[in-house]
Swiss-Prot record:
UniProt PTM comment: The GPI-anchor is attached to the protein in the endoplasmic reticulum and serves to target the protein to the cell surface. There, the glucosamine-inositol phospholipid moiety is cleaved off and the GPI-modified mannoprotein is covalently attached via its lipidless GPI glycan remnant to the 1,6-beta-glucan of the outer cell wall layer.
Signal peptide: 1-19
Gene name in the database record: TOS6
Taxonomic source organism: Vanderwaltozyma polyspora (strain ATCC 22028 / DSM 70294 / BCRC 21397 / CBS 2163 / NBRC 10782 / NRRL Y-8283 / UCD 57-17) (Kluyveromyces polysporus)
UniProt keyword Membrane, yes or no: yes
Broad class of where this protein is predominantly found: secreted
Keyword tags: Cell wall, Glycoprotein, GPI-anchor, Lipoprotein, Membrane, Secreted, Signal
UniProt similarity note: Belongs to the TOS6 family.
Keyword flag Endoplasmic reticulum: no
Protein known as: Protein TOS6
Topology within the bilayer: Lipid-anchor; GPI-anchor
Length: 106
């Protein structure tokens, strides 16, 4: 048998196999589900949208103290007055307390 005859025989065999495979009928059996279930849940979280501030003032003989406490930190401010000013020191301390309070409220 010559090489050309073998090649022709192999080619005709593949032609028959491919012709036979083209006559196969395919059936689609994909099924779509009728009901679907979602597994998503929601959690609601709330928090307080503000902070609490506590102000306190203390007037001593020679100084004025201011304490400010919030939910996050505490701040203390002390202002010393000059000694020997007499009644002027007390009036100045009252004015200082009022000025600090007004500044914090604005």
């Amino acid at each position: 048998m010559k090489f050309s005859t073998v090649a022709a025989t192999i080619a005709s065999t593949f032609a028959v196999a491919s012709a036979a495979s083209e006559s196969v009928t395919y059936v689609d059996i994909t099924v779509t589900p009728e009901v679907t279930t979602s597994m998503v849940s929601t959690v609601k979280v709330t928090s307080t949208p503000y902070t609490t501030t506590t102000l306190s003032f203390a007037v001593q003989s020679n100084s004025v103290s201011h304490n400010e406490t919030t939910s996050n930190s505490t701040q203390t401010t002390t202002v010393s007055l000059f000694e020997g000013a007499g009644n002027t020191a007390q009036v100045g301390a009252g004015a200082l307390v009022a000025a600090v309070a007004a500044a914090l409220l604005l």
